[in-house]
Each structure stands twice: as structure tokens, then as C-alpha cells.
Regions:
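Membrane-proximal intracellular helices of multi-pass ion channels
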Residues: 1-232
Length: 232
């Protein structure tokens, strides 16, 4: 196995995860709640660790199917391990195991939760919690492929490991470009839902939360009784 290239790609994935936390940080700043530093610290950790992993020298820059499976398997584990940090650092979910459960449930769009009082969490963390549904709905590694420059057969091995179904190599010649097209469609459908919910009278913040969770099919809400709280 090409361990150097596996670590380099995982490093890129961690940096992408740090970028994904930026909207949640902005929400925390807007509402001036106590989760601001939790996101800043987590993003710094992700960037430093990701950069160090990316800087590992690799003589052979090619990898094969088993390397792709390793990247996907370890990638899902790493984004969940680091994605749980804002909950723990902020003190909103003191137990790391509970925070990890919540994050894994988000990224895998399972929808299970250990939270009894969802509304007690600060808005930035609730935003991140639902955003994990949106990211996981398309696939964490597919997002990485969408932002990476074309890498030929290497991206094909990652896509094969990430996506079930027909052989993607027989469907599309350029995996990275196809990932971008998929995300454009995903974002477009999400925007349509945002518009419809706003027309229906839902506040913007709540609209984004429920769009992320329903588009990703995870079902997380910022209300204890989910959409039933709106009585509409």
C-alpha cells in the first residue's frame, strides 16, 4: 500500500473539513454564543494536522484500489473523530463518546441522537450538527473529489470505494468533473427547498437547518419536536 499517498489525501480531507466548519463559525459569531472558540480551536487543529499529513513526501504518487478503500474507510473515521471536537470543547456535550455518536450519526445521515434537549445547544453547534447531514448526504469523499484538481485514475479508486452501484469508470470519463456536477445539482435542489421554506414563513436559520437535514436525509432539527414545533 502507498501509505504516503493515503496520508496525503487524508490530510486534504481534514483541511476540507476545516473549511466546512467556517459557516458554523460565522453563525456562532453572528449570534455571539459560547461556541465561537470551540470552532476556532477545532479548525486550527484540523488545518495543522491536515497540513502535516499533506506534507509527507511520497515517491510514488499513484495508488490503487486497496489504497482507495483505505482512504475512504479512514476518511469517514477521521472526519467523525475531529467533527466531534466542537461539541466537546464548547462543553455542550461533555462526553466525547456522546459527541462522537452525534457526529457519526450526522455524517452517516442515520439521524439518531443522544440529545434530550436539542434547543439547549448554541446555534453554531446546531448548524454544524445539521450540516454534517448535508455533507454526508452526498458523501464526504465525493466532496473532496469535487474540490480536488483532476488526478486521473487516483480519483476513480476513491469514487469506487465511496459509491456503491455500477462501476463509475464505465459511466464517466472524468470523476472529479462528475463530482462537481453532482454537487451543483445537490446545491440547486437545496436552494429550491430554502426558497420554498422561506415562502412558507420559516425563519432563515431554521430553514437552513431543516434543508441540510432533509436534503441529506438525516433528519436533524433545531427543535425538540422537530417540524412539529411549527404547528403548520
Amino acid at each position: 500500500m502507498n501509505f504516503a499517498m493515503i496520508l496525503k489525501n487524508l490530510g486534504i480531507l481534514l483541511i476540507v473539513e476545516a473549511a466546512c466548519m467556517l459557516p458554523s463559525l460565522l453563525v456562532a459569531i453572528i449570534y455571539k454564543q459560547f461556541d465561537i472558540m470551540a470552532f476556532i480551536i477545532t479548525m486550527m487543529i484540523l488545518i495543522v494536522v491536515g497540513f502535516l499529513m499533506y506534507c509527507i513526501p511520497a515517491r510514488n504518487k499513484n495508488f490503487y484500489a486497496r489504497d482507495g478503500f483505505a482512504i475512504v474507510s479512514l476518511g469517514w473515521i477521521l472526519v467523525s473523530l475531529f467533527g466531534a471536537l466542537p461539541f466537546v470543547i464548547s462543553g455542550a456535550i461533555p462526553s466525547y463518546i456522546d459527541a462522537l455518536f452525534e457526529t457519526v450519526s450526522g455524517f452517516t445521515t442515520t439521524g439518531s441522537s443522544i440529545l434530550r434537549d436539542v434547543e439547549s445547544l448554541p446555534k453554531g453547534l446546531l448548524f454544524w450538527r445539521s450540516f454534517t447531514n448535508w455533507i454526508g448526504g452526498m458523501g464526504v469523499l465525493v466532496m473532496m473529489l469535487a474540490v480536488l484538481p483532476a488526478a486521473g485514475a487516483n480519483t476513480l479508486h476513491i469514487m469506487k470505494a465511496e459509491s456503491p452501484g455500477p462501476d463509475p469508470g464505465k459511466l464517466v470519463p472524468r470523476i472529479g468533473q462528475s463530482a462537481k456536477i453532482l454537487y451543483r445539482m445537490y446545491i440547486g435542489l437545496s436552494l429550491i427547498q430554502v426558497i420554498l421554506l422561506l415562502i412558507g414563513g420559516m425563519p432563515l436559520y431554521d430553514t437552513l437547518i431543516h434543508t441540510f437535514s432533509t436534503a441529506g436525509t438525516g433528519g436533524f432539527s433545531n427543535m425538540n419536536t422537530s417540524v412539529g414545533a411549527y404547528n403548520n
